[in-house]
Protein backbone atom coordinates (compact mmCIF):
# COMPACT_ATOMS: atom_id res chain seq x y z
CA UNK A 1 0.00 0.00 0.00
CA UNK A 2 1.37 3.39 -1.03
CA UNK A 3 1.53 6.35 1.32
CA UNK A 4 0.91 9.75 -0.23
CA UNK A 5 1.30 12.94 1.78
CA UNK A 6 -0.64 15.99 0.63
CA UNK A 7 0.68 19.51 1.11
CA UNK A 8 -2.34 21.76 0.77
CA UNK A 9 -1.41 25.06 2.40
CA UNK A 10 -0.20 28.19 0.60
CA UNK A 11 3.21 28.31 2.36
CA UNK A 12 5.53 26.62 -0.13
CA UNK A 13 8.71 26.98 1.90
CA UNK A 14 7.10 25.39 4.94
CA UNK A 15 5.72 22.59 2.79
CA UNK A 16 9.18 21.85 1.40
CA UNK A 17 10.67 21.91 4.89
CA UNK A 18 8.13 19.40 6.20
CA UNK A 19 8.57 17.28 3.07
CA UNK A 20 12.28 17.00 3.78
CA UNK A 21 11.52 15.73 7.28
CA UNK A 22 9.04 13.06 6.18
CA UNK A 23 10.75 11.97 2.96
CA UNK A 24 11.90 8.56 4.28
CA UNK A 25 8.30 7.64 5.12
CA UNK A 26 6.43 8.57 1.97
CA UNK A 27 6.05 7.10 -1.50
CA UNK A 28 4.36 10.06 -3.19
CA UNK A 29 4.45 13.80 -2.52
CA UNK A 30 1.20 15.56 -3.42
CA UNK A 31 1.29 19.22 -4.37
CA UNK A 32 -2.18 20.14 -3.16
CA UNK A 33 -4.79 22.24 -4.91
CA UNK A 34 -4.38 25.30 -2.65
CA UNK A 35 -0.62 25.21 -3.08
CA UNK A 36 -1.13 25.15 -6.85
CA UNK A 37 -3.71 27.97 -6.68
CA UNK A 38 -1.25 30.10 -4.73
CA UNK A 39 2.00 29.37 -6.54
CA UNK A 40 0.97 27.83 -9.86
CA UNK A 41 3.27 25.34 -11.53
CA UNK A 42 6.20 26.78 -9.58
CA UNK A 43 5.03 24.68 -6.62
CA UNK A 44 5.34 21.51 -8.70
CA UNK A 45 8.71 22.61 -10.03
CA UNK A 46 9.96 23.31 -6.51
CA UNK A 47 8.99 19.86 -5.26
CA UNK A 48 10.54 18.14 -8.27
CA UNK A 49 13.78 20.07 -7.87
CA UNK A 50 13.95 19.35 -4.14
CA UNK A 51 13.00 15.68 -4.46
CA UNK A 52 13.98 14.48 -7.95
CA UNK A 53 13.71 10.80 -7.01
CA UNK A 54 10.26 11.07 -5.44
CA UNK A 55 6.97 10.67 -7.28
CA UNK A 56 5.35 14.12 -7.57
CA UNK A 57 1.56 14.23 -7.74
CA UNK A 58 -0.20 17.43 -8.83
CA UNK A 59 -3.77 17.66 -7.55
CA UNK A 60 -4.76 20.02 -10.34
CA UNK A 61 -8.35 18.74 -10.77
CA UNK A 62 -8.48 19.12 -14.55
CA UNK A 63 -12.00 19.56 -15.95
CA UNK A 64 -11.28 21.24 -19.30
CA UNK A 65 -8.39 21.99 -21.65
CA UNK A 66 -7.01 18.55 -20.85
CA UNK A 67 -4.18 18.50 -23.38
CA UNK A 68 -2.85 21.94 -22.43
CA UNK A 69 -3.24 21.41 -18.69
CA UNK A 70 -1.54 18.02 -18.63
CA UNK A 71 1.31 19.33 -20.77
CA UNK A 72 1.80 22.29 -18.43
CA UNK A 73 2.07 20.11 -15.33
CA UNK A 74 4.16 17.47 -17.06
CA UNK A 75 6.68 20.10 -18.11
CA UNK A 76 6.78 21.33 -14.50
CA UNK A 77 7.80 17.86 -13.33
CA UNK A 78 4.56 16.18 -12.27
CA UNK A 79 4.47 12.39 -12.48
CA UNK A 80 0.74 12.24 -11.76
CA UNK A 81 -2.16 14.63 -12.37
CA UNK A 82 -5.81 14.50 -11.35
CA UNK A 83 -8.73 14.75 -13.75
CA UNK A 84 -12.32 15.13 -12.55
CA UNK A 85 -14.68 12.22 -13.22
CA UNK A 86 -17.64 14.55 -13.74
CA UNK A 87 -16.15 16.18 -16.81
CA UNK A 88 -16.75 14.86 -20.34
CA UNK A 89 -15.29 11.56 -21.50
CA UNK A 90 -13.49 13.41 -24.28
CA UNK A 91 -11.65 15.55 -21.74
CA UNK A 92 -10.69 12.48 -19.70
CA UNK A 93 -9.53 10.57 -22.77
CA UNK A 94 -7.57 13.52 -24.18
CA UNK A 95 -5.94 14.12 -20.81
CA UNK A 96 -4.94 10.47 -20.54
CA UNK A 97 -3.62 10.29 -24.10
CA UNK A 98 -1.55 13.41 -23.59
CA UNK A 99 -0.31 12.13 -20.23
CA UNK A 100 0.77 8.81 -21.74
CA UNK A 101 2.75 10.59 -24.45
CA UNK A 102 4.58 12.57 -21.75
CA UNK A 103 5.16 9.62 -19.40
CA UNK A 104 2.67 11.00 -16.86
CA UNK A 105 -0.20 9.13 -15.22
CA UNK A 106 -3.78 10.25 -14.56
CA UNK A 107 -5.73 9.63 -11.37
CA UNK A 108 -9.47 10.08 -11.85
CA UNK A 109 -11.00 12.05 -8.98
CA UNK A 110 -14.45 10.61 -8.28
CA UNK A 111 -15.57 13.58 -6.18
CA UNK A 112 -18.02 14.90 -8.79
CA UNK A 113 -18.94 11.63 -10.47
CA UNK A 114 -22.60 11.23 -11.38
CA UNK A 115 -22.25 7.45 -11.02
CA UNK A 116 -19.31 6.02 -9.10
CA UNK A 117 -19.79 2.54 -10.48
CA UNK A 118 -20.00 3.75 -14.07
CA UNK A 119 -16.97 6.01 -13.71
CA UNK A 120 -14.96 3.14 -12.24
CA UNK A 121 -16.12 0.79 -14.98
CA UNK A 122 -15.17 3.13 -17.84
CA UNK A 123 -11.95 4.55 -16.43
CA UNK A 124 -9.49 1.96 -17.71
CA UNK A 125 -10.73 2.17 -21.30
CA UNK A 126 -10.34 5.95 -21.17
CA UNK A 127 -6.68 5.56 -20.22
CA UNK A 128 -6.89 6.30 -16.50
CA UNK A 129 -4.16 4.76 -14.31
CA UNK A 130 -5.82 4.97 -10.87
CA UNK A 131 -8.96 6.18 -9.07
CA UNK A 132 -9.36 8.52 -6.11
CA UNK A 133 -12.22 8.08 -3.66
CA UNK A 134 -12.35 10.71 -0.99
CA UNK A 135 -14.42 12.63 1.47
CA UNK A 136 -14.97 16.24 0.39
CA UNK A 137 -12.84 18.49 2.58
CA UNK A 138 -15.77 20.62 3.72
CA UNK A 139 -17.88 17.69 4.89
CA UNK A 140 -17.94 16.65 8.53
CA UNK A 141 -15.30 14.18 9.61
CA UNK A 142 -17.03 10.85 9.11
CA UNK A 143 -16.15 7.83 7.02
CA UNK A 144 -19.65 7.24 5.64
CA UNK A 145 -18.28 7.70 2.13
CA UNK A 146 -16.50 4.36 2.59
CA UNK A 147 -19.93 2.78 2.11
CA UNK A 148 -19.31 3.51 -1.57
CA UNK A 149 -16.05 1.54 -1.60
CA UNK A 150 -17.52 -1.69 -3.01
CA UNK A 151 -19.30 0.25 -5.74
CA UNK A 152 -15.93 1.57 -6.92
CA UNK A 153 -13.63 -1.38 -6.27
CA UNK A 154 -16.14 -3.87 -7.61
CA UNK A 155 -16.18 -2.17 -11.00
CA UNK A 156 -12.47 -1.75 -11.72
CA UNK A 157 -9.13 -3.51 -11.72
CA UNK A 158 -7.34 -0.17 -11.41
CA UNK A 159 -5.62 0.88 -8.18
CA UNK A 160 -7.89 2.91 -5.88
CA UNK A 161 -6.54 5.50 -3.43
CA UNK A 162 -8.48 6.81 -0.42
CA UNK A 163 -8.29 10.31 1.02
CA UNK A 164 -10.37 10.74 4.16
CA UNK A 165 -8.96 13.28 6.61
CA UNK A 166 -6.99 10.31 7.85
CA UNK A 167 -5.86 10.33 11.47
CA UNK A 168 -4.73 7.87 14.12
CA UNK A 169 -8.39 7.64 15.17
CA UNK A 170 -9.71 6.36 11.84
CA UNK A 171 -6.70 4.85 10.07
CA UNK A 172 -7.58 1.25 10.90
CA UNK A 173 -11.05 1.58 9.39
CA UNK A 174 -9.50 2.97 6.20
CA UNK A 175 -6.88 0.22 6.07
CA UNK A 176 -9.56 -2.44 6.49
CA UNK A 177 -10.89 -1.46 3.06
CA UNK A 178 -7.45 -2.38 1.68
CA UNK A 179 -7.00 0.48 -0.79
CA UNK A 180 -3.93 0.57 -2.99
CA UNK A 181 -2.89 3.85 -1.45
CA UNK A 182 -3.81 6.29 1.31
CA UNK A 183 -3.50 10.07 1.12
CA UNK A 184 -2.74 11.86 4.38
CA UNK A 185 -2.54 15.59 4.98
CA UNK A 186 -2.86 17.76 8.07
CA UNK A 187 -2.45 15.03 10.70
CA UNK A 188 1.14 14.84 9.44
CA UNK A 189 1.75 18.34 8.09
CA UNK A 190 0.33 20.00 11.24
CA UNK A 191 2.00 17.61 13.69
CA UNK A 192 4.59 18.77 16.20
CA UNK A 193 6.83 15.99 14.88
CA UNK A 194 5.86 15.34 11.24
CA UNK A 195 8.54 12.68 10.73
CA UNK A 196 7.37 10.64 13.71
CA UNK A 197 3.76 10.86 12.56
CA UNK A 198 4.64 9.92 8.99
CA UNK A 199 6.65 6.94 10.21
CA UNK A 200 3.65 5.71 12.21
CA UNK A 201 1.37 5.66 9.15
CA UNK A 202 4.07 4.37 6.81
CA UNK A 203 4.81 1.37 9.01
CA UNK A 204 1.10 0.61 9.41
CA UNK A 205 0.48 0.78 5.66
CA UNK A 206 3.47 -1.45 4.94
CA UNK A 207 1.60 -4.33 6.59
CA UNK A 208 -1.10 -4.23 3.91
Task: Give the label of every model feature segment.
Residues 24-27, 49-52, 79, 100, ...:
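Generic secondary-structure signature for well-ordered alpha-helical cores
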Residues 37-60, 94-112, 145-168, 199-208:
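Alpha-helix-loop-beta-strand connector modules within alpha/beta enzyme cores
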Residues 10, 34, 61-62, 85-88, ...:
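Short, ordered loop/turn segments at secondary-structure junctions
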Residues 129-199, 204:
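Active-site/ligand-binding-proximal alpha/beta "capping" segment
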Residues 3-7, 29-31, 56-60, 81-83, ...:
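Hydrophobic faces of well-ordered beta-strands that scaffold small-molecule active sites
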Residues 21, 46, 72, 122, ...:
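Well-formed, non-transmembrane alpha-helical positions, independent of function
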Residues 3, 65-68, 72-157:
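Conserved anion-binding
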Amino acid sequence: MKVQISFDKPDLEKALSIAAQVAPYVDIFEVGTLLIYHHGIKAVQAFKEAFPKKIIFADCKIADRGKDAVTLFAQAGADWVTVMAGTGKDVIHTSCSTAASLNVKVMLDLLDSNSLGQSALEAKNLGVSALLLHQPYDEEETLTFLDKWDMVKGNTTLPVFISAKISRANIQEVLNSQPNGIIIDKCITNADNPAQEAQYFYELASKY
